[in-house]
Design a protein with these regions (language model features):
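Catalytic-core regions of core metabolic enzymes
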Residues: 1-291
Length: 291
């Protein structure tokens, strides 16, 4: 079951023949992901990694039946690639690209409404359902199959959490790296809601960071949902000064509720088990599941 991805998901790669697309497509195939082809305009009709290359996403979908796309396209073209995937009927679009202009993403996100496509990212590590399918840039060997769902703004903290959860003897259903940009396709709350409705996911790890209101929105949803699945939360950027961007474009304290302390307070008030250090994620999730 899990969420978003399963072992039969058919995946295409946009920007397939480029350096990044080639490297990560190879890693995905080795993990067991059903990569069925890719898109590079002007190279349609050729093959790459023993898979067909198409000029357009529409051609790729009509030939392969793909329902998932991962995008390794330069920032100036990435928003168009997202919209092209949605137009072609792709249901899950994962955009890895960092540095997409904000106005481009505002347009792309609005465009996706009503298309039936879900966007993960941009500027994200992707999505992985353990032992089934990996659509992203994460090191697959860290993710062991289990019963914990992960939603995170941070790629590396996703990997850290997954490693700790595995070492605690638990493992994950799916990990969703939602991305660290100000405008992203799937919010923390929307990802948490997916896990709340997934019968295989028994607990959730929610990793946020300074900037924006997504964590507070998710926390209030968790409080009001009536769902008793335990949630462990962590907020990165606890020492960040106001007005200083910390890595991600969206990780900047602009107002009082953007700080790590404010977010952690709201999360605790909403019943989330908040940890002060990422080193405590694994043992805390093990503890709350055992209760």
């Amino acid at each position: 079951m899990a969420v978003l991805l399963h072992q039969d998901s058919k995946v295409i790669v946009q920007g397939f023949t480029g350096t990044e697309g080639t490297f990560h497509a190879t890693q995905m195939i080795e993990y067991g992901t059903k990569v069925v082809g890719g898109v590079t305009p002007g190279k349609g009709g050729t093959t790459h990694l023993d898979l067909p290359v198409f000029n357009t996403v529409a051609d790729a979908v009509s030939t392969t039946g793909a329902d998932v796309s991962i995008i390794f396209v330069p920032p100036s073209f990435a928003a168009d690639a997202i919209m092209e995937a949605a137009d072609a009927g792709i249901k899950l679009v994962v955009c890895i690209t960092e540095g997409i202009p904000v106005q481009d993403m505002v347009h792309a996100k609005e465009y996706l409404k009503g298309t039936g496509a879900r966007l993960i990212g941009p500027n994200c590590p992707g999505v992985i359902t353990a032992d089934a399918s990996k659509v992203g840039i994460m090191p697959g060997f860290i993710f062991k199959k289990g019963k914990v769902g992960i939603v995170s703004k941070s790629g590396t903290l996703t990997y850290e959490a997954a490693d700790q959860i595995a070492k605690a003897g638990l493992g994950i259903t799916t990990a969703i790296g939602i991305g660290g940009d100000p405008i992203i396709g799937t919010t923390t709350k929307e990802a948490v809601e997916l896990f709340m409705n997934d019968p295989e996911t028994e607990a959730i790890v929610m990793i946020g960071e300074i900037g924006g209101g997504m964590e507070a929105e998710a926390a209030r949803y968790i409080r009001d949902s009536g769902n008793k699945k335990p949630v462990v939360g962590f907020i990165a950027g606890q020492t960040a000064p106001p007005g200083r961007r910390m890595g991600h474009a969206g990780a900047i304290v602009g107002g009082a509720e953007d700080t790590a302390a404010a977010k952690m307070k709201i999360m605790e008030e909403c019943g989330i088990h908040v940890v002060a250090s990422p080193a405590d994620i694994g043992k805390t999730i093990a503890s709350v599941i055992a209760q």
